[in-house]
């Protein structure tokens, strides 16, 4: 099993798909990494040589991935909340921040519906 950036890459997957197991690497970036390392992206991870894996590790070291990327994202959101801007306020309240409607929908951000209080006499 190949280990890149502290992540075990599934050996039965193609190189392009296997690299997406690393947080911060999607399909496009994975394909570009394979092209830069001159590796066929359709080749299985288990069929890659140690030198191929070393090339991939060296190339991936240039990017912000995994824990550093998660930390950076969290710090960016925290900064928005600290400066008190609109987006930070929406993050704090758990609401969508890009202009979507919230009277109906927005259930992903708001969570399950809360039962309406009944008005019995």
UniProtKB/Swiss-Prot annotation:
The keyword Ribonucleoprotein applies. One of its GO terms (biological process) is translation. GO terms for cellular component: cytosol; small ribosomal subunit. Disulfide bonds: none annotated. GO terms for molecular function: rRNA binding; structural constituent of ribosome; tRNA binding. Keywords: Ribonucleoprotein, Ribosomal protein, RNA-binding, rRNA-binding, tRNA-binding. Residues 95-121 are annotated as: Disordered. Belongs to the universal ribosomal protein uS13 family. PANTHER family: 30S RIBOSOMAL PROTEIN S13/40S RIBOSOMAL PROTEIN S18, SMALL RIBOSOMAL SUBUNIT PROTEIN US13M. Part of the 30S ribosomal subunit. Forms a loose heterodimer with protein S19. Forms two bridges to the 50S subunit in the 70S ribosome. Located at the top of the head of the 30S subunit, it contacts several helices of the 16S rRNA. In the 70S ribosome it contacts the 23S rRNA (bridge B1a) and protein L5 of the 50S subunit (bridge B1b), connecting the 2 subunits; these bridges are implicated in subunit movement. Contacts the tRNAs in the A and P-sites. This is Small ribosomal subunit protein uS13. It comes from Polaromonas naphthalenivorans (strain CJ2). The gene is rpsM.
